[in-house]
């Protein structure tokens, strides 16, 4: 639906327009800081899963314009996957009103997906209706040392099979990269000593569980134990 844009200027605001716990959606303006959206969802007992290092300063509009991925993309997808509807100012100075919380919409062209990731070249996103999810009851995280990328791929395959949808994070980092961080920022240090600190590859593995802390721990330890026995992982540092 197109309607004329009234006024000669557009101001992108930062309000939360609506939060629907029945449909698990939140409608926010593009100037909203990502962290503020996360907190609004948390206050309603829900999770908005997009998370990245700049979440205290980046805006939802920027996340949408770049189709940001974040740390939990394995489970929840990119920003495009988290979006149900948009409000956009077009190049003609009109507002395209596609702010809908409809889960299944197979009518016509999907302009929403064209605008997301276009970095403002097709229009300026001014608001969005986003998906919310149940908050996890417990989570487990481990930093692992590995000898090769092949081992990392096999570990990821085992984690997917063992955790299913509960696998929320898997980040692979080279040892050279982490050593460079330590050199440039002497106040930082690796959590491993000796030969383990010189490992060629590190992986960060995360599980989020909807049942209980005990259930999360058991699943996590089972998959990780099997990976260690198979020689995929050399050393692990676990936080539960």
Task: Identify the function of each model-found stretch.
Residues 1-12, 238-239:
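Single conserved hydrophobic/aromatic residue that forms the stacking wall/gate
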């Amino acid at each position: 639906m197109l309607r004329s844009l009234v006024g000669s200027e557009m101001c992108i605001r930062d309000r939360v327009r609506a939060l629907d716990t029945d449909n698990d959606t939140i409608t926010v303006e593009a100037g909203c800081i990502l962290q503020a959206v996360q907190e609004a969802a948390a206050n309603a007992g829900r999770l908005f899963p997009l998370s990245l290092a700049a979440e205290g300063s980046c805006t939802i509009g920027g996340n949408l314009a770049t189709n940001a991925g974040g740390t939990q993309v394995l489970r929840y997808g990119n920003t495009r996957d988290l979006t149900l509807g948009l409000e956009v100012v077009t190049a003609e100075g009109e507002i395209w009103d596609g702010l809908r919380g409809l889960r299944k919409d197979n009518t016509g062209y999907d302009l929403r997906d064209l605008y997301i990731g276009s970095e403002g070249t097709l229009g300026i996103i001014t608001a969005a209706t986003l998906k919310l999810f149940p908050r996890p009851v417990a989570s487990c995280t481990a930093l692992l040392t590995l000898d090769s990328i092949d081992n990392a791929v096999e570990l990821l395959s085992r984690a997917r099979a063992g955790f299913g949808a509960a696998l929320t994070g898997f980040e692979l980092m080279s040892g050279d990269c982490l050593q460079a961080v330590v050199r440039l920022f002497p106040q930082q240090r690796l959590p491993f000593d000796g030969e383990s600190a010189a490992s060629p590859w590190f992986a960060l593995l995360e599980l989020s569980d909807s049942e209980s802390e005990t259930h999360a721990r058991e699943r996590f330890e089972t998959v990780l134990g099997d990976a260690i026995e198979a020689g995929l992982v050399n050393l692990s540092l676990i936080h539960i």
